[in-house]
């Protein structure tokens, strides 16, 4: 009964090495009317295959950079064929990045990364958000991280007001559970911001002054860290991200102008 909701889908059964355990379950499910296949070689063979693929996956990339709240993730979600690393990791790659999410472990992340990218042409120019090597608890594959360093770099800019609004829309800090989770993270900022600033943030959060709370975090924590980490970067293009629909069009135009972009037909969905 547990599997009945999945009867219309193709199921894959596996064990460690693809032996009799998974074979017998496959036969049983097939006799019960399920569409089912056995994973040849088992999970261990699958993992070797995934790791071999990730070791050499270095596609040409367009990497979106910009300060927290500028809209990078929103654009990645809207651009066809992009790779959303934060979605794969289920983490926003920041100190508050796990709020509302269930971060994945390394093996799950790598498996999902493989599923997302293995069918893409190796030379297809792809959008990705600029990240450090670590996203939450997981590490980006080394070859892909190297491709990000060598990719085309675009700097996105937006006003403080716009960034605060977008962060507020993303985190929705209005229910008690979310507020509790955010407040519980604040002590981890004492070393960077000092006790007084952290107490100020806690007070603003308790008073539901979310715009002020986010503004201070951006000015005193996120922006200085971003500027320090990106101080040596040189960008191929700078774009305003005030109007994300226009920014999306500008990005697709930039993509199409590149000498190697693999997919020549990228369209904006209306």
Positions of predicted regions on the chain:
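Catalytic cysteine-centered active loop of the rhodanese-like fold, especially the PTP/DSP P-loop
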Residues: 1-39
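Conserved nucleotide-sensing/catalytic segment adjacent to the nucleotide-binding pocket
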Residues: 80-147
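Pre-Walker A (Motif I) flank of P-loop NTPase domains
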Residues: 9, 58-62
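Long, charge-dense
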Residues: 38-51, 168-172, 182
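Glycine-rich phosphate-binding P-loop
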Residues: 21, 62-80
